[in-house]
Amino acid sequence: MVERLTGRERQQALQSIAGWREVEGRDAIARSFVFTDFNEAFGFMTRVALVAEKADHHPEWRNVYKTVEVVLTTHDAGGVTRRDIDLAAAMNAIAGQFGVA
């Protein structure tokens, strides 16, 4: 089983993934991505879905028009783990392909 990050480890990791923040009241991290339109937002979600499925680690997310809101936590570990940080970094890289920093 993957280990939950300590508060210090989580803070250090968050510094390496732009735009992500801790979720108040939960051991989770979150970010909103805003794209040009729905097609880009859906394209982003499709690409992330392939990465998430391969990693067997799936986001909590929702999409409204051009905005995708994401929450990451590792339910089995009861909080944020390296798997969440890695998926967040992958999401940032995919968003970058659409010009979203």
UniProtKB/Swiss-Prot annotation:
A Pfam family: Pterin_4a
* Top-rank EC class of the record's enzyme: lyase
Q: Name one GO molecular function term.
A: 4-alpha-hydroxytetrahydrobiopterin dehydratase activity
Q: Which UniProt keywords apply?
A: Lyase
Reaction equations catalysed: (4aS,6R)-4a-hydroxy-L-erythro-5,6,7,8-tetrahydrobiopterin = (6R)-L-erythro-6,7-dihydrobiopterin + H2O
Cell membrane as UniProt keyword? no
Q: Which GO terms describe its biological process?
A: tetrahydrobiopterin biosynthetic process
Q: Please state the Enzyme Commission number of this protein.
A: 4.2.1.96
Against Gene3D superfamilies, the record matches this protein to: Transcriptional coactivator/pterin dehydratase (3.30.1360.20)
The protein's matches in NCBIfam families, at most eight in alphabetical order, are given as: PRK00823.1-2, PRK00823.1-3, PRK00823.1-5
Assigned protein family: Belongs to the pterin-4-alpha-carbinolamine dehydratase family.
Name of the featured protein = Putative pterin-4-alpha-carbinolamine dehydratase
Q: What phylogenetic lineage does the species belong to?
A: Bacteria, Pseudomonadati, Pseudomonadota, Alphaproteobacteria, Hyphomicrobiales
